[in-house]
């Protein structure tokens, strides 16, 4: 009961901050954020703030999770690549809104925790997980209709752009980390030409691996 009340409260909070997509709000209300927060911080799971999860990583602020998800413009039919599974919270949100989610985490310990939460506790069947360098993407599963990057890269990783399907969209924080970055939407036209739009300033941990 506590989990659901916390999630419902978060959904109302992000709605008050401007999130409008009913499906995104419903997903925020349904996913128990405390499941993805370290036990010592679970009393803060209902706060709209990023929290440390170890290994220099964080579980993102719920508003940012909702904003990024909303900007993917999901209809329920998409195959989504997530770069940076982290705690698995964003992955669980995506799983409720997309047909398939392919998520990559470079830190083995975090990947194992996320796997337990997503596959063993929540029993999500449309999620595939991999441990490795997310900046390289998941070539054998490409192309993807959507790509979501949950760590800041100095530039948009070219491998991810290459794996984005025509008509697809990527949402990625771009800029130096630590520090202030910009959340960028990259739309790939049916002609293969990319159009970039800067959305909001954000603060993310740095992308590690070849593009970090």
UniProtKB/Swiss-Prot annotation:
Its EC number is 2.1.1.77. Transmembrane segments: none annotated. GO terms for biological process: methylation; protein modification process; protein repair. It comes from the Bacteria. It catalyses: [protein]-L-isoaspartate + S-adenosyl-L-methionine = [protein]-L-isoaspartate alpha-methyl ester + S-adenosyl-L-homocysteine. It is found in: Cytoplasm. SUPFAM superfamilies: S-adenosyl-L-methionine-dependent methyltransferases. The active site is at residue 60. Keywords: Cytoplasm, Methyltransferase, S-adenosyl-L-methionine, Transferase. InterPro entries: PCMT, SAM-dependent_MTases_sf. GO terms for molecular function: protein-L-isoaspartate (D-aspartate) O-methyltransferase activity. GO terms for cellular component: cytoplasm. Catalyzes the methyl esterification of L-isoaspartyl residues in peptides and proteins that result from spontaneous decomposition of normal L-aspartyl and L-asparaginyl residues. It plays a role in the repair and/or degradation of damaged proteins. Belongs to the methyltransferase superfamily. L-isoaspartyl/D-aspartyl protein methyltransferase family. This is Protein-L-isoaspartate O-methyltransferase 1. It comes from Anaeromyxobacter sp. (strain Fw109-5). The gene is pcm1.
């Amino acid at each position: 009961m506590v989990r659901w009340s916390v999630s419902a409260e978060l959904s109302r909070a992000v709605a008050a901050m401007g999130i409008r997509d009913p499906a995104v709000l419903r997903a925020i209300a349904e996913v128990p954020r405390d499941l993805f927060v370290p036990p010592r911080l679970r009393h803060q799971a209902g706060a709209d703030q990023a929290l440390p999860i170890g290994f220099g990583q964080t579980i993102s602020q719920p508003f940012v999770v909702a904003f990024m998800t909303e900007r993917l413009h999901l209809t329920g039919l998409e195959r989504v690549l997530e770069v940076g599974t982290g705690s698995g919270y964003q992955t669980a949100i995506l799983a409720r809104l997309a047909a398939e989610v392919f998520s990559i985490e470079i830190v083995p310990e975090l990947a194992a925790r996320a796997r337990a939460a997503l596959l063993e506790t929540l029993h999500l069947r449309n999620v595939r997980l991999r441990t490795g360098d997310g900046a390289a993407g998941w070539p054998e599963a490409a192309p993807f209709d959507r790509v979501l990057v949950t760590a800041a890269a100095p530039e948009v990783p070219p491998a991810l752009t290459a794996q984005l399907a025509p008509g697809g969209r990527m949402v990625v924080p771009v800029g130096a980390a630590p520090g202030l970055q910009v959340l960028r939407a990259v739309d790939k036209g049916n002609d293969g030409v990319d159009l970039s739009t800067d959305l909001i300033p954000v603060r993310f941990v740095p992308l590690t691996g070849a593009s970090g």
